[in-house]
Amino acid sequence: MRRATNGRTVRTVVVDVAGAQRSGLIDVLRQDGDIVVVGQSGDAADAIAQVAQTRPDVVIVDLHLPGSQSQHAIEQIMARTPTPILILSGRLDDRQSPSAVQALVAGALEALPRPLHWTPELAAELRRTVRLISTVHVIRHPRGGLLKGSRRDAALGAGKAPVVAIAASTGGPSALATILAGLAGLQAPVLVVQHLHTDFVDGLVDWMSRVSALPVETASSSQTARPGRIYVAPGGTHLRLGGNLRLELDEFPVSVHRPSADELFSSVADSAGAAGIGVLLTGMGDDGARGLLAIRRRGGVTLAQDEASSAVFGMPKAAERLGAVTEMLPLDKLAPGIHRAVRQVQS
């Protein structure tokens, strides 16, 4: 049954293999009277042309197209006709999960696991996500390759013990690629929160390990954060900094987001004080704004990604409005800004 419309049409192109799979997906979308499928294709070149011709509000891309067609379609759409892209991935294994992360780096806004059967709950989540990202103004992604970095461990520096906390949401993986590749030799632990469906977090960590200039791992409860290493919040779990650089994890629903940027930043403010360095990247909503303000009030350095380089300026803008941002920087200046902040803490 199609539900009543609210007057705002979301024009959508579906890029998926032909047959029952694509038909089922389109049927699920059409249950929302406001979502209109204006194009469909199982071929990358044809999909790229359809998007350029129809100028949809959202493109849905399944990652199971033959060869590397899905990735190629995403890269070319974002380079030629920037459009909010939702990717669907089936059963996640060691091959598929990194593909989802690469798609996010290429410019896709969101990723959802594709179920074998669309339950009412999963169908509602799909339609809700389509409507949400349809409102996002996306930026052009002219490059398709992953950034490379040379991995090296950093020695513990003299002076205070700085701690870097980075948080991102929509558009975050691409921004993280740029930043992490520029952190070679950083003499501080780096704690990362990325809003992402739980099923994709392991793939994110694996991919980050390949593009980062520093070793990357999933954070574990009670481990000590070491300088020159990057710790990523597990899926569906808050990451906090405790005393003596001890990491704390919990799944208590204290925020709409789990992991939460506010939870991470607030804990860094409490535990590191003026040695805390907060970095807020692209994303929808306002998660992280209050936590970043807490770091600044304790004397720490707070950086945020500027509007021009953000896929979505919501989170940095919310922090700026609160007066939480020490310095607003373009993406390519954030890694140097982090190095500078660490040296400032240690001086």
Mark where each language-model region is.
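Conserved acid/base catalytic micro-environments in cytosolic active-site loops
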Residues: 1-36, 40-347
